[in-house]
Structures are given as C-alpha cells and as structure tokens.
Amino acid sequence: MNATNLQLISHAQKIDHVFKIIGYIVNPLGILFNTLLIILISTKTPKLLQSYSMLHLNFALCDLFSCLAGMLALQKIVFSGWSLTYIFHGACGQISSYFCYFLHVFVCHCLAHSQWILMISFLYRYYILDQISPDTVKIVRICILTYLPSLLFVIVYWSDVANEDALKRIVNSFHPEYIYDSKEIWGDLVIAGNMSCWSAATFSAIVYMTIPCFPIYGVIVFFRHKTLKSLDGRGRITMSETTRSSHKQLIKALTIQAIVPIFWLTASTFYLLALFQVVGRVIVENMPFRIMECMPMITPLISLYFVRPYRSALTGWFFPTSLLKPVIASAMLSSTAASVAPTP
C-alpha cells in the first residue's frame, strides 16, 4: 500500500462520513415530520376531508417507512462493470447484507409508489369538482389497487439479490485502489446488490423505477390544467368562493408536491452517470440516495403548511392561545399608551 492509496482511501472515508451525517440528519427529520402529519390526519381531519385524507395518510406512511429504511441502510453506490453494487453504512449491517438489500428495495419501491399516489391526488381533486366525494372505503381500495405494481416490484427486485462474497470479489477487481477487502481499513464492510443490471428481474425493476414517471407526470399536468380552468370560472362548475379557494389551496399544495420529484430526477441522473461509468467520484457515489432521501422529508412539510386544519392544529400546539393572549394584550396596551401619551 503506497502513500497515494492511503490518501485516496482517507479522502473516501471522510466523504463517506460527511454523507452519513447528512443521512442521520435528513432521515430522522423525515420521520418526525411524517409522524406529526400522521397524528394530525388521525385527530384533526374535518369530516369533509375524510376521504381525501386517506391519500395524505398513504403519502405519509410511505414517506415515514422510506425515511426509516433509509436511516437503517445509509447506502452508497459503487458500480463495478454492469454489476449494481451498494455499500451500506447503516445499522442494517449488524443483521445481514440481505436485510440491507431488502431496505434498498423497500426505499426504491416507496419512492416509486409515491408517484402513483400523487397522480391519484390530482385525479381526485378534479373528480370532486362536480361529483360527490367518494367514501373512505373506496379511496382505501384505490390505494391498495395502485400499490399492487409496487408490491410486485419488491418481489421481483428482491428475488435477484446476488451473493455477497461474489459481489465483494467484483468490487475489489474493479476498484483495487480502495482495498475494500481489508478489514483493518474498512472493518466489516457490507455489500449487496445485483450481479448484472441486464438480468430480467433487475432490468424490469429499473424500467419500473424510471419509465412510468413520464406518463404519470403527463396525466398530472393535464388534470392540473383542467382543474384550474374549472376553478377560474372557465368551466361550467359553480361553487362558493370559499369552496373555490379551498380547492385552489389544495391544488397549490399538490403542484408544489409535483415539483419535489426534481430530487428524484437529479438523483437518477447521478445514478445513471455512475452506472455507465461517466463519473466515478466518491461524492457522486454518495449523492443519489442522500438526494432521494430529501423527498420524503420535504413532502409532509407541504401538507402541514397548505392543508389549513393541519396548519391550524400545529400552530395551536406550538403557540397555544393561552400563551398568545397575554402577549397580544400587552402589545395592545403598549400601543394604546403610546397613542394617548401627551406630546412634549
């Protein structure tokens, strides 16, 4: 081992450590925000939003488990040829590489499933403009039905997990400069993944993760336009200004949620660049999953802010009326005293 190798390895370990810290910040925040949202959905949802809240709940549960799995995995990509190899720095390594791989599959399936729920949310907002809101049971059935492709994705993708020792040999052959087989340097390194991205199971999983987003976003843009057209009075739908304002607020929230997957696009770009060996820096190896983990952390914040009952309840928790009243009264007294004070 020469000085150049030592410097390279030291640099890689420092970068890995920085991204581990980022993962330990982003994922717990996501767990906190989604837990808050789930509690508010369960306790503060008004009757008129009961059925729609099932979509929020589906989102929140999906994001919550995605953050939990991401925190346990803390994976980075180290592609070697056409093999999809991942190094896991999280606590999952204390159990087994197979468990780490399952967490990887689970995170991917959560992120893919969230796209379907987002599309259904837009379809729902358009549907109820001139139709009776479907009951909660029907919404739950729709959520279960749209989850089936993602469940199949988990089964297919998980079935193609490769032998850990075989993957370690491949990684060491493609990246000998990092000496990944040295326990003195890396400890008990946990590696999992797939032998080839061209195998039927893995390739179909990659297709499911990437291709459906294009037609899904096409549907989202189309129905967003139709919904806003109706709300602006250009459609034939008549409603009160309060109802119209409520619809617009929820559509605004959904529109911002539809922008959040830019993280997905950015992460996928880095992922493909690494896969096709266009770039191979340690930073790029760590970036895709840290970027993707920002999505389930940000999404609940949008619902917490734009859905008025949840925002009001959250404000009441952190700024109780009993605490605000003395402050407001004091401010009013000060203002009154200043206005009646004699002018010198």
UniProtKB/Swiss-Prot annotation:
Instruction: Tell me one Pfam family matched here.
Output: 7TM_GPCR_Srd
Location in the cell: Membrane
GO CC field? membrane
InterPro entries of this UniProt entry?
Answer: 7TM_GPCR_serpentine_rcpt_Srd, GPCR_Rhodpsn_7TM, Nematode_rcpt-like_delta
Keywords of the record, alphabetical order, are: Membrane, Transmembrane, Transmembrane helix
Membrane spanning residue stretches:
21-41, 54-74, 102-122, 142-162, 203-223, 259-279, 287-307
Topology term for the membrane: Multi-pass membrane protein
* Family, similarity comment: Belongs to the nematode receptor-like protein srd family.
Q: How is this protein named in the record? A: Serpentine receptor class delta-3
